[in-house]
Regions:
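N-terminal phosphate/diphosphate-binding loop that engages ATP/GTP or pyrophosphate donors
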Residues: 3-14, 18-99
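Phosphate/Mg2+-binding loops and adjacent switch elements
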Residues: 88-120
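Generic structural motif recognizing short loop/turn segments at the entrances and edges of beta-strands
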Residues: 1-3, 105
């Protein structure tokens, strides 16, 4: 069995969270320690917490801190990319993922959609 899976969609609102719920349910019946990870979230603002992270942490009662479930915000990622530091962004995401991989038996990753973001 693999030790991680990355769920992504071809567009926003494609059902990633529903797939994530089903996979997390299955994984918890098969694997002792499962982590949830999103590489990039919209905001770190307490009032605007990521709804997928909140849902997964609460529904499956994961023993994880919220701050351990993501690598950076959209704003941080955009700043790194526009300043020519894409490699730093990739390194930051990879380091956060590897920390989870070292602590958990399986890491379920859910991609991010930026349907409401200006990507031009």
């Amino acid at each position: 069995m693999a030790h991680s899976l990355y769920i992504t969609g071809t567009e926003g609102s494609s059902g990633k969270t529903v797939v994530t719920l089903g996979l997390m349910h299955f994984l918890q019946s098969q694997v002792r320690k499962v982590a949830f990870f999103r590489p990039i979230i919209d905001s770190e603002d307490e009032a605007r917490r990521d709804s997928s992270i909140n849902l997964i942490l609460k529904h499956f009662e994961l023993d994880m801190l919220y701050r351990d479930t993501y690598a950076c915000t959209y704003k941080e990622a955009l700043e790194l990319v526009t300043s020519g530091n894409m490699s730093l962004l990739i390194e930051k995401i990879f380091q956060k993922y590897k920390a989870l991989e070292n602590e958990y038996d399986f890491v379920l990753c859910q991609g991010t959609d930026f349907r409401d973001k200006d990507t031009a």
